Amino acid sequence: AIGADIHMAFDELTAPLAARGTIVKAMQRTHAWAERCLVRHDELNAEHLARGENLQALYGVVQGARDETLRRHSANFLGERNFDGYGIGGVFQPGEIADVVSWVCETLPEDKPRHLLGLGSQPADLFLGVEYGIDTFDCVAPTRQARNGALYTFDGRINISNARFCEDFAPIDAECDCYTCQHHTRAYINHLFRADEILGATLASIHNERFVVRTVDQIRASLLDGTFFDFKQSFLARYYGDDLPIGVTL
């Protein structure tokens, strides 16, 4: 009804430390829902085609928590169905990306896109996901963190509400080309947050979203010219310094 270009089949998410029996039942339910969604999706696309409308893409969602056998089974089950792409759900921590994503991506068809659901709360997630085979991401973190004054810069994350920015008339990030950085200063954004003005959250969100998009653009360029690992090392070393997240190596 809303005309989404991509939508996900229903899936059941389990807690990472749930009992294996619970995880198995949730995975089986996810698979049953996936097949039902695929049938209805094909019916709806036939209607779209008859009306000359754009077709929608449906992704199956791989589950299985932290269990390699279940993850590979789920990826194989869904990979045998004619989905347009695949989502990977239930990855809670960056430290899980290397294992879970690699298990799944080794099993899924190579010619279909892979989407990592709900992970991207920090730049390292993007690099890890791409390194292990992810094509696209979604995450609320850039805007949620922006609403709380946490802003991304290429030299690390800052809290724009801190007193040290009250008289800082530089942009949030001198290298950023977003509307916020081109038109406003750290001092002004600091004032907006201290005054509890909604415009502060809006301008902060614009900046964080642009930072993420620029980072992904740069990752794509590095893949095309064969410099991904060099770019990853230089970017993360500058952003995190000696405080690398768990599971991240340079």
Report residues per predicted region.
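Alpha-helical initiation/capping and key positions within long helical/coiled-coil segments
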Residues: 22, 26-29, 70, 204, ...
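Generic secondary-structure signature for well-ordered alpha-helical cores
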Residues: 35, 39-42, 106-109, 194, ...
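Non-catalytic, usually N-terminal nucleic-acid engagement modules in DNA/RNA processing proteins
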Residues: 1-51, 163-166
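C-terminal extensions of enzymes
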Residues: 11-17, 175-250
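Alpha-helical packing segments of well-folded alpha/beta enzyme cores
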Residues: 26, 30-33, 37, 74, ...
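Glycine-rich phosphate/ribose-binding loops and adjacent secondary-structure elements
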Residues: 28, 40, 44-48, 53-172
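Glycine- and acidic
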Residues: 15-20, 24, 84-89, 198-201
